[in-house]
A protein has these predicted regions:
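N-terminal anchoring/stem segment of glycosyltransferases
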Residues: 1-76, 236-245, 250-279
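A conserved donor-nucleotide-binding helix/loop in the catalytic core
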Residues: 24-26, 31-32, 73-102
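Short glycine/proline-enriched coil/turn segments at helix->beta-strand junctions
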Residues: 38-42, 94-99, 117-119
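Short catalytic/ligand-binding loop motif for oxyanion handling, primarily in non-cytosolic enzymes
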Residues: 52-56, 108-111, 130-132, 171-173, ...
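The conserved acidic donor/metal-binding loop of glycosyltransferases
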Residues: 103-107
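Conserved donor-nucleotide/metal-binding helix-loop-beta segment in metal-dependent transferases, i.e.
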Residues: 108-143
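Short, flexible, basic/aromatic active-site loop/helix in glycosyltransferases
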Residues: 140-153
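Catalytic core and acceptor-binding pocket of nucleotide-sugar-dependent glycosyltransferases
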Residues: 152-241
Length: 279
């Protein structure tokens, strides 16, 4: 199964003026890509020209089977400060199915039984917390935009840090509705609008087509023993930015794991300026 990493650099550039990645994000990106290739198949990075430049300068392009720059084509109407994860949606548009769509801070440690995952499988679903997943009246849309009346707002959202999608019709409906929503949002915050497009529309579109969604795990199980199969560092990032000791320990552990499992990449790691303090 081919996996897709994505990196749209526009959100960070708009926020900070330049593109950069934290040291721990560089390391999880490397570990995520290499572990997928070891256990589950090919993986590509869908990025933009700035992302390609960044990875080239650090000698990282070889961790993927391919690096493409289709995200240069994201239209200007998509606001990167609101839709900061739009690149992941567009990466599926440009890649098609079947595909495993995976965040760069998500690691799959072992071989997956893809035949058991059905037409669409997500890592876990989520409760409908009103401050994260508000109802339809919350959204301020451009004149003429109408939500599809078949969308079921009672469905639990899907966490899309990792999902496997085989059904072409579903991929086209989901990405089409997500892009239509993002293009027609009249402003909006960077949480509720983004997670609606990315995480709420997927189960809604699955239900519209009568496709059962397979939920791989749940938060309780992932917190209890998830590292046997999956690691997602999203929840640790703020802590690592605030705690230099925790950050250094995490980075050194990642480096040890990469050099133990993939010793041919040690010289690449040593050449990445952001990682030099850990050698």
């Amino acid at each position: 199964m081919e996996a897709i990493h994505s990196n749209w650099t526009a959100p960070r550039i708009k926020a900070d003026g330049i593109y950069y990645a934290d040291d721990f994000d560089i390391l999880t990106t490397i570990l995520s890509a290499l572990k997928w290739r070891e256990k589950n198949g090919q993986i590509k990075m869908v990025t933009d020209s700035e992302g390609l430049r960044y990875y080239n300068e650090r000698g990282m392009c070889g961790i993927w089977d391919a690096v493409t720059t289709e995200l240069d084509n994201i239209p200007d109407v998509i606001d990167p400060s609101v839709f900061w994860a739009a690149g992941k949606i567009y990466s599926l548009v440009y890649s098609g199915t079947p595909a495993a769509v995976m965040d760069t801070d998500f690691i799959v440690w072992d071989k997956l039984a893809f035949d058991n995952l059905g037409e669409i499988a997500v890592i876990h679903d989520e409760d409908i917390y009103p401050d994260v997943y508000p109802d339809i009246s919350h959204f301020n849309m451009k004149r003429g935009y109408v939500f599809d009346p078949e969308l079921d707002w009672r469905l639990r959202p899907s966490n899309t840090a990792f999902y496997v999608i085989r059904n072409k019709e579903l991929a086209e409906l989901y990405t089409g509705e997500a892009v239509r929503f993002m293009e027609n949002a009249a402003g909006g915050d960077s949480l509720t609008y983004m997670v609606f497009a990315e995480q709420r529309l997927l189960p809604m579109c699955s239900a519209m087509l009568g496709i059962d969604m397979y939920v791989i795990s749940n938060l309780e199980r992932l917190f209890r023993d998830g590292e046997r199969w999956f690691t997602h560092t999203w929840g640790m990032k703020r802590q690592m930015r605030e705690n230099t000791a925790l950050r250094a320990d995490f980075c050194r552990r990642c480096i040890r794991r990469i050099t133990a499992d993939f010793p041919e990449y040690e010289s690449m790691l040593r050449g990445i300026e952001e990682l030099r303090p850990y050698f």
